Regions:
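Active-site region of glycoside hydrolase catalytic domains
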Residues: 2-71, 95-96, 114-116, 125-224
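Active-site mouth loops of central-metabolism enzymes
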Residues: 72-86, 161-166
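A generic structural signal for short
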Residues: 78-79, 119-120, 219
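Internal amphipathic alpha-helical repeat/solenoid segments
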Residues: 80-91, 113, 124
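Catalytic domains of carbohydrate-active enzymes, especially glycoside hydrolases
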Residues: 86-107
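Glycine-rich, proline-tolerant flexible connector loops at the mouths of alpha/beta enzymes
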Residues: 106-120
């Protein structure tokens, strides 16, 4: 007879990204990251929301986003669901659901605000320490994504983002810091989310500003 049902140790879980959930985009030492500049118009139609032109970043959009850091309506990643300040109550709800694993990403700019800082931001590390400790206290395993699109904005403006080996070096240092400081709290690691996003959504995936590139397609390839 065919067995049905799930194995006893099957991991029922949930997932989110730091940029989608945390908010608090300049709180406790966090630096600006690339997702903080993603524009959204609440009046867009369903079709407009998926248009490639609205998902791409250009110089005009980039400068406009930096010029108004108080605009939360058109830059929703800046506030998310305020998970950074309300994670305890959200975690209680996760536990009520009976989930056994939580996949969330770690925000690079919360650990190294500029990406190339000499020392990590201790407030950022403490946030993830407390969150992951609480997950385990609720019997929830931690599945941590090291990079879910967003990188510190400084790495884009100073070095050109993923086109530069400097950004790769900073990523390695960031990753090593996570392993050293959070390694005993994380059950599973994922180095990159949707590695192929660089092709179908270049600003998300590899943080390119389209009209700053002489050869856009070649720049995407170089980043990947």
């Amino acid at each position: 007879m065919m067995k049905t049902g799930f194995p006893k140790d099957f991991l029922w879980g949930g997932a989110m990204a730091s940029s989608q959930a945390e908010g608090a985009f300049l709180q406790d030492g966090k630096g600006l990251d690339t997702q903080d500049l993603r524009y959204f118009d609440p009046n867009w139609t369903k079709e407009e929301r998926t248009q490639k032109s609205n998902r791409r970043m250009n110089d005009e959009k980039f400068k406009a986003a930096l010029a108004d850091l108080e605009d939360l309506e058109h830059y929703p990643f800046r506030h998310g669901i305020d998970f950074y300040n309300r994670w305890q109550e959200d975690l209680e709800l996760f536990a009520e659901l009976g989930i056994k694993v939580l996949r969330t990403s770690i925000c690079w700019a919360r650990i190294f605000p500029n990406g190339d800082d000499a020392q990590p931001n201790e407030a950022g590390l403490k946030f993830y320490m407390d969150l992951f400790d609480a997950c385990h206290a609720h019997g929830i395993k931690v599945f941590a994504t090291i990079l879910h699109y967003n990188i510190p904005l400084h790495l884009v403006t100073e070095y050109g983002g993923w086109k530069s080996r400097k950004t790769v070096e900073c990523y390695v240092r960031y990753t090593r810091t996570l392993f050293e400081r959070l390694g005993d709290r994380v059950d599973y690691w994922l180095p990159f989310n949707e590695f192929n996003a660089g092709k179908f959504n270049p600003y998300n995936g590899v943080c390119l500003i389209e009209d700053q590139e002489e050869d856009y397609q070649n720049a995407i390839f170089q980043c990947l």
